[in-house]
Amino acid sequence: MFKRHKSLERKRELLFQGLPQSTMKNNARNFHSLSQLVLSAGPLKTTTAVKHSKTTHFEIEILDAHTRKQICIVDKVTQTSTIHDVKQKFHKACPKWYPSRIGLQLEYGGPYLRDYITVQSVAASSIITLYFTDLGQQVGWTTVFLAEYSGPLLIYLLFYLRSSYIYDVKESTRWPRHPVVHLAFFCHCIHYIRLLLETLFVHKVSTGHSPMKNLIKGCAFYWGFTSWMAYYINHPRYTPPSFGNRQVIVSAINFLFCEAGNHFINTVLAHPNHTGSNACFPSPNYNPFTWLFFLVSCPNYTYEIGSWISFTVMTQTLPVGIFTILMTIQMSLWARKKHKIYRKKFNSYVHRKSAIIPLIL
């Protein structure tokens, strides 16, 4: 009995000693499988923090400039939006007004806001009030220039080539044309062909628009004066200049000189220097025709007036003289206006210069 009891106790001890070993084996096996699962899943992915945008939106109230009544409200306008973007949204709300005929003012009677101006630059708060004015039917500036310059070219060509249809046939065949008539035709064509080519390939024409009434006024001015000049110069009874060929040759050379200078100045204005502190100020280069920049702020107008003065002396006709006087007055006003802008921006460069005529104007 004692031996049997002892053997039972021995079996119990062996049984209790065997249980932890099997449990440890199972735990090790489970840990191994878990580690294999983690390794096969790959590295843990880091979650990126979501940034909430704090973009400020403006609400623009558009009122009629005359009646002060509300037309519409343009909302959800961002800080980087421009006046052009506001016009686009205004056009969607009111389709009868397309963007080119929309004029927006910050205050009644103030200047119209340019398309490139940002909304943030004119905003005093999140709510902005703008005044709307209908600018009427608009035309692109390239169309305006092409219409104004192509008309004189074709009109003068008609008077020169079809004189028998305009004047008396007997007088046209009786009186031979003076050489200055042919030279005037050549110079006139050179002038307007240059303007047309520069409009298409040289000038950086603004993307803005001009009212239709300005196109009509410009065409009436250029076309009307060209018809008057061409009628007198190509008339069978046209009287040549008083000093003969000497007057014609000198004025023709000066005309071509001014035309060349005008072209080179326009080329410089279209491709300004972008180095130095005067990045936007037009400056002369190695070309002698551009050295007029040392004396005046707007040498292109100076050369233009010089061309028409030379044409007046060459043809010695009243219509050309009147046209030259009117062009001189108009270009002087343009030059003085541009000269004031240059003085505000680049006073150290233009304070000793004249606007259009050296030492005079």
Curated annotation (Swiss-Prot):
Expression is highest in the heart with very low to almost undetectable levels in brain, skeletal muscle, stomach, pancreas, liver, kidney, small intestine, and uterus. Gene3D superfamilies: Phosphatidylinositol 3-kinase Catalytic Subunit, Chain A, domain 1. It comes from Mus musculus. Belongs to the steroid 5-alpha reductase family. Its EC number is 1.3.1.-. This is Trans-2,3-enoyl-CoA reductase-like. Its main location: membrane. Keywords: Endoplasmic reticulum, Membrane, Oxidoreductase, Phosphoprotein, Transmembrane, Transmembrane helix. InterPro entries: 3-oxo-5_a-steroid_4-DH_C (IPR001104), SRD5A/TECR (IPR039357), TECR-like_N (IPR049127). The chain crosses the membrane at residues 139-159, 181-201, 215-235, 309-329. GO terms for molecular function: oxidoreductase activity, acting on the CH-CH group of donors.
